[in-house]
């Protein structure tokens, strides 16, 4: 696998940064994967890490000194990072390995007293700064936040995005921006706040019924929102909101202001007033100039948007049928393409091209919801692998093809993973596949108390794998937006997350269910559906929830070891396939329908 940037370009980038560090009397430079909104997915302007290191993964932290450059990534990216950093001067630092200290500890241990660490305060969260200062300050190390040294060294840095912001009609949103603002203001008053700052892009888009295209795959736009008790201000780049939309917003007492004025406006808030903001989603550059009192808590909109309304869920169910129909047509094509691959070569890139074309035929299709993961055999062992023109595999011979894909529609966001056997699967592959399927079914069938901390559900999914002394490094579930980000919170199904009040499972939340098992250098398996919390009933012990499975697409049964499935697990699988067939058959014809009918026949041992 080749790197996304050449070894020489990475070396040139590091050399330029080190020269700038020397000129600024800076001993270390910290480059987080972040922007002024602490987004998971970044606009091109903020893609500093790939330019600096050549690593193309979506998450990672870089530390550079005059004689060291390190990239910190978690286990999802170890295999990918090893390949992409090969031949560079960047060391791979594995988060979670005892021999590799966290980047904060590394800085504290390696830098001398009196050293200075530079990091762009516009992209550093308050919580991250506090963690850094707790380790660096006692050792006499200074943190400098007003320098963007990597950005100054990037000669062809892309501009900030200028695409127009779009209005999301209430017929799709389900509630007006006035109603949503009223809910947020109620929460502000409950916490004694006259003002509330929102910097998270999906919160801003949800709250104001707006969408954009500033970040690949995520229908959001660069913005901050400052909410008062009677009006609100939307800070965006010039030209992004046209006159007609500006007038619509003004009807809701939302007024458009220049993007770069937000810090100044915040600094001018009355000292006697109180500002509510989320310290985990707000940067130092915005908060350091405040004079007002503050309340630090999660954005109320984060809770509100996670609990989808009945209106939104009805749209999502329709979108799942559309997406499922496109997927059936795709898998019917794939089956034929694999059969003919000796004559017409098939590769990982062709998977994404065909999926995109078929989804684009569906009403309301907007875009992919993330870069498609099409990974054959060893590539599947990298959970976040992406095929590129420079590096992709041919699909031929025997093996497992993992396809993780999703789409944005006007009425919802999809995310699904299926594994397709190519040729004849081996017994070890079948064993792994069956274990992952058992894990997915276990979580799908679970009933649990309303309000339980979502990380506590993780062990249920992992138990079938733990029984085999197997494990996977990523979380089992993440929240999913409503025609918004494919990753949202506050819920997360991962035992590595800290159970807290904000992770409570509530009705209407959409979460992924995606256990996996990865054999580096051999294969990867992940099976994923989206599920929604719904009431399972009440008893003397309170209300309980269960999952409604939203995703509609057959699960491959070729790799199942029937002897390893219990009767109740087989019953769940057959009931799921019956529902898939019932809802998708009316939307299909020809080869797609034939494939669906074949792939939803009852499974028997």
Task: List the predicted regions and their residue ranges.
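Active-site neighborhoods and metal-handling regions in enzymes and metal-associated proteins
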Residues: 1-605
């Amino acid at each position: 696998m080749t790197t996304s940037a050449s070894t020489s370009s990475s070396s040139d980038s590091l050399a330029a940064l080190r020269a700038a560090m020397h000129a600024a009397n800076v001993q270390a430079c910290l480059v987080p994967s972040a922007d002024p909104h602490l987004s998971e997915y970044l606009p091109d302007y903020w893609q500093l890490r790939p330019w600096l290191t050549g690593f193309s993964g979506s998450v990672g932290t870089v530390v550079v000194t005059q004689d060291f450059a390190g990239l910190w990534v978690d286990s999802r990216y170890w295999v990918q990072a090893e390949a992409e950093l090969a031949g560079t001067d960047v060391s791979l630092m594995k988060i979670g390995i005892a021999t590799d200290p966290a980047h904060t500890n590394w800085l504290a241990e390696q830098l001398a007293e009196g050293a200075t660490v530079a990091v762009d305060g516009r992209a550093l969260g308050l919580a991250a700064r506090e963690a850094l200062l707790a380790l660096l300050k006692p050792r006499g190390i200074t943190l400098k936040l007003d320098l963007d040294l990597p950005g100054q060294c990037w000669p062809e840095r892309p501009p900030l995005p200028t695409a127009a912001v779009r209005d999301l009609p209430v017929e799709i949103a389900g509630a007006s921006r006035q109603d949503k603002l009223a809910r947020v203001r109620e929460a502000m008053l409950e916490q004694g706040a006259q003002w509330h700052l929102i910097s998270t892009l999906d919160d801003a888009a949800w709250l104001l019924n707006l969408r954009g295209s500033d970040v690949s795959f995520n229908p959001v736009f660069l913005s901050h929102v400052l909410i008062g008790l009677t009006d609100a201000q939307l800070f965006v780049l010039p030209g992004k909101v046209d006159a007609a939309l500006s007038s619509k917003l003004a009807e809701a007492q939302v007024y458009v202001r220049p993007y770069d004025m937000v810090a100044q406006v915040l600094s001018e808030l009355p000292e006697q007033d109180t500002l509510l903001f989320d310290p985990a989603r707000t940067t130092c550059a915005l908060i350091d100039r405040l004079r007002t009192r503050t309340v630090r808590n999660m954005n109320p909109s984060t809770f509100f948007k996670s609990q989808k309304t009945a209106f939104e869920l009805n749209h999502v169910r329709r979108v799942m049928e559309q997406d499922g129909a496109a997927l059936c047509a795709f898998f019917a094509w794939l089956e034929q393409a694999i059969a003919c691959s000796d004559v017409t070569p098939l590769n990982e890139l062709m998977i994404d091209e065909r999926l995109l074309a078929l989804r684009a035929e569906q009403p309301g299709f907007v875009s992919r919801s993330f870069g498609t993961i099409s990974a054959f055999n060893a590539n599947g062992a990298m959970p976040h692998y992406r095929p590129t023109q420079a590096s992709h595999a041919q699909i031929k011979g025997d093996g497992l093809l993992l396809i993780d894909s999703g789409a944005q529609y006007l009425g919802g966001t999809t995310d699904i993973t299926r594994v397709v056997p190519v040729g004849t699967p081996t017994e070890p592959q079948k064993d792994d596949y069956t274990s992952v399927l058992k894990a997915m079914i276990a979580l799908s069938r679970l009933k649990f108390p309303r309000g339980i901390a979502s990380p506590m559900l993780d062990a249920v999914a992992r138990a079938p794998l733990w029984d085999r002394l197997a494990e996977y490094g990523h979380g089992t579930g993440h929240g999913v937006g409503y025609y918004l980000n494919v990753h949202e919170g506050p819920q997360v199904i991962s035992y590595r997350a800290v159970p807290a009040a904000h992770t409570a499972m509530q009705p209407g939340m959409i979460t992924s269910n995606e256990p996996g098992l990865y054999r580096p250098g051999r294969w990867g398996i992940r099976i994923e559906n989206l599920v929604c919390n719904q009431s399972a009933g009440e008893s003397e012990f309170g209300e309980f929830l269960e999952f409604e499975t939203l995703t509609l697409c057959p699960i491959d049964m070729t790799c199942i070891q029937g002897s390893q499935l219990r009767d109740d697990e087989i019953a769940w699988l057959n009931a799921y396939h019956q529902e898939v067939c019932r809802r998708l058959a009316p939307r299909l014809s020809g080869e797609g329908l034939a494939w669906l009918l074949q792939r939803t026949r009852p499974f028997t041992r």
